[in-house]
């Protein structure tokens, strides 16, 4: 995942215009967008991460960092303005610290345990500047200086502020202000002579001198090709030059003095695995010191390892199944020199100075070798001191047949003493892959000293805190100054040098009365000049001089209208059309507008206690359309105790169940209608399709009046009947309706009086008597009990018996929910059920189901006995009528 960090010079000098009419800052913004378009052509660009840094003071200069998305990056890029100084050194340090923010947390640098090229975070910093003088608060600088102090923990472990996988490139804008005759340009873009060029060379990058738009596009295409995964290594020649060329003659030119290929600061490509997309490797590049277990700290390392190569030709050594790493070198004078020798079968060993314990140069850890096709040069990384180790391995497998002798073990132990201890882990893994896992004991492990481990762990924790602080500060705006401080231009004179010195002495001694103090604003320490706030519009009605000359007549008319208008209304400082006139750039900024409008939903009232379930598990979620089926099994007599999952209802209609009543079984299959449509718009549903089941428990509305049509619309019931009122409109599907509070109180009072001498079987006669069909305009039957007079009066106002049954079921449900075993009022209310016998039986079935939901077993037994009595008497009536 390459990281592309753009460092844009936003100093005041970027406001200068080119011959194209655009400012340098606009050209820089366009260059960033063009680079992103060119980069998007590569499929590997999906994992790119873009960051944006300016030359403002940290942390305000960080516009887009680790957490910001692409939209934030583009928005911050468009809003950049060219103000301030050219503090390029401080901004570069900020950019490097931003890239190194998480390296200690992830352990990618692997301090003290070798450098792993396959542990990398490739980053490219692209600086776009005008190449003018570097200005700071202390003055003008001729050279680029990066601050030595860094607030980032662990920065002392590396001498330079950058790392070996970070490269710096600079686009120095040199576009003229006047159009010139375009001269013939050289084929290659020239380096720039600005101070940033030296910094680019140190990191492995380069600078570009941009003199025209065509060269800018050429530079951007070159930068896109520079986005490669790799690390920078400093190659340095050790020893004499190769004496003989391919033709057998010496080269007199290259044998005198230092040549460019003697010291190269170039990149080695670390290709990611095509399957995983992550680079893989086996062997590290050795450290430039021998690790000491007694050392409390680690010596600081250089950003780029210094790899020395010897020009002595040797044969490349490779053993079957031995893992090795192969890295291609970036084209450089060194690769050109090696390829010109045309010797693909010879190699030059490479070393790291002071990596061995007793040798200054160290032992070889790999070699440089030209490819067979002579088109590139590769760096092969092998085990440390491979000229000694590889012959030992060859003898082990070919001569000893993987059974080492005592002499071989002694040679192997001597080799281990010359190898840095951080090679133990990779060597164990390699031997395991080759089929010799027991050569090195498991007890042989390498680890840093306890003090170093504690130190690194402490640095990692501090780096995590610093990372959170920096990430949290990104996006904050620089605090605007309230005013410009005024300083006195001339130094204050001594009192003895003032002309009125004698008069001042007389005032102090009291000889002369004191003069009033003259207010001199220049001597006031806190005097400031207010800055003009562009966001605040001038109040032109306060100051006539703020009104433009072209708007005087319009402004006078507006002030006259406001003067004659009633004082109850707000004054208007602008026309209504002008209030909606905004620049085109701000028309699409909906997010800022949405922040100022009130929320359509009110805030939650946290003071009110949250309503819990009144039945069952209080932690159970309210599942819509889910039913508890244990009650069904209890009523139907099924002894299966296993729960089954309920099914969602079709438009609130429960799943069909087998009817328990023999009268209902023998009922002809006439399609009854279920009143479950909403607002009376949906078609009625046949009973052949669905049958009533346990209704869904919902809240029962209080203080409603069924005499009003609105109340009828709120009280609905899954009720089955043969005939329905055509004009009955139900607008809300609920299981039960409600009675008025007066009727409920009257019913409860009657139940308290009559419950002592209640007998359920006495009601069966009354329940069975009302068997005649009820029409649409049929009124409810009156009851002789005086306690129910008020309720009966309300029932007589109902337009159909369905509404009366809705009221009854609401009352019965309320009685079922009450604790205790006094069920007299329930059976009393059952006498008032209206409709034919089939409707009454279905009503009774629903009551039994509700009782089962609340586990009222005693009530269920009485209701079932009541149902059997009705069946028995109904059969007697049918027998007498048949006779």
UniProtKB/Swiss-Prot annotation:
One of its GO terms (biological process) is RNA polymerase II transcription initiation surveillance. CDD domains: vWFA. GO terms for molecular function: protein-macromolecule adaptor activity. One of its GO terms (cellular component) is integrator complex. Its main location: nucleus. It is found in: Nucleus; Chromosome. The keyword Transit peptide does not apply. It comes from the Eukaryota. InterPro entries: INT_SG_DDX_CT_C (IPR029307), Integrator_subunit6 (IPR051113), VWF_A (IPR002035), vWFA_dom_sf (IPR036465). PANTHER family: DEAD/H BOX POLYPEPTIDE 26/DICE1-RELATED, INTEGRATOR COMPLEX SUBUNIT 6. Belongs to the Integrator subunit 6 family. Component of the Integrator complex, composed of core subunits INTS1, INTS2, INTS3, INTS4, INTS5, INTS6, INTS7, INTS8, INTS9/RC74, INTS10, INTS11/CPSF3L, INTS12, INTS13, INTS14 and INTS15. The core complex associates with protein phosphatase 2A subunits PPP2CA and PPP2R1A, to form the Integrator-PP2A (INTAC) complex. Component of the integrator complex, a multiprotein complex that terminates RNA polymerase II (Pol II) transcription in the promoter-proximal region of genes. This is Integrator complex subunit 6-A. It comes from Xenopus laevis (African clawed frog). The gene is ints6-a.
